[in-house]
């Protein structure tokens, strides 16, 4: 019987939200299972985990220095401390399985679990795995990925686990009208949702201030989350005489409601964003981050290739590009419907259930191989 599961994932929404989705799915299938989310005291999980009704345990954040600095010499001791603290949590909650989602806390959790003979499950949300999950995948046969191209040997393709609010999102005409009214928008106008992640995206903001008037002239209204640091700048640059509603917010406190209000989205292409939009059947213009290893472009490709979105490089995005490529979709109910159907078909709505099944399979291997909580 599965009694206690530790889910390690913290720092960013891309690590925290999948962990929470799996925790919710485990709770729904068996309320007796003890669920502990392992994170840091300063990441998003410090706010999100308690808000979702789950227990949070923390370990020190041990980032890998990107260039040689004196901090490199402190890394081994700090990492060992994180492993010890993760191990204390595993002992305290008598963990049957450790599930890691990458990020700062997963590597210490994997090593602490390995030392104790606790089965490990790894979930990788991105096309290219990070260091922590490359390590974790070497320690277990229970590896789940979100993309078929992810280079982790022996992995099972599950997709990204999503919260129930996204999977059951109602985007019927009546629900869309109600969602728009809650944001002070016209219930009947085509609606573009713009957001750039939790901190916003300056290039998206700049394009929207330039495109606001021609979009409004075409009958399009906008719900735009600028990011808290960018709000005043965007508000000052936005035209005042727009003929259609333009609802400007520093952030969106309930993203499912924003998805329900929108016909199309202009956004970055983080793994969670792409998975949520696919599940919601919401077409998007994806603008990958212009730096990093190109993973945001890879995140968006399955949906774009299926016909559920448009893809444009950050350097190529402009008001004229938006008007030439996105506006014709926004004003065509037929094109929106086709893209929505294609978008929804590119997702993995059973991801959380598949990972729960993998967790139970992992727990069963320990029961067969050794007494529960026997010393390694």
Curated annotation (Swiss-Prot):
A GO BP entry: cell wall organization
One CC-aspect GO term: plasma membrane
SUPFAM superfamilies the record matches: UDP-Glycosyltransferase/glycogen phosphorylase (SSF53756)
Pathway: Cell wall biogenesis; peptidoglycan biosynthesis
Subcellular location: Cell membrane
Positions contributing to UDP-N-acetyl-alpha-D-glucosamine binding: 12-14, 126, 163, 198, 296
Membrane protein topology class: Peripheral membrane protein
Enzyme class: transferase
Function (record text): Cell wall formation. Catalyzes the transfer of a GlcNAc subunit on undecaprenyl-pyrophosphoryl-MurNAc-pentapeptide (lipid intermediate I) to form undecaprenyl-pyrophosphoryl-MurNAc-(pentapeptide)GlcNAc (lipid intermediate II).
PANTHER family: GLYCOSYLTRANSFERASE, UDP-N-ACETYLGLUCOSAMINE--N-ACETYLMURAMYL-(PENTAPEPTIDE) PYROPHOSPHORYL-UNDECAPRENOL N-ACETYLGLUCOSAMINE TRANSFERASE 1
Protein name per Swiss-Prot or TrEMBL: UDP-N-acetylglucosamine--N-acetylmuramyl-(pentapeptide) pyrophosphoryl-undecaprenol N-acetylglucosamine transferase
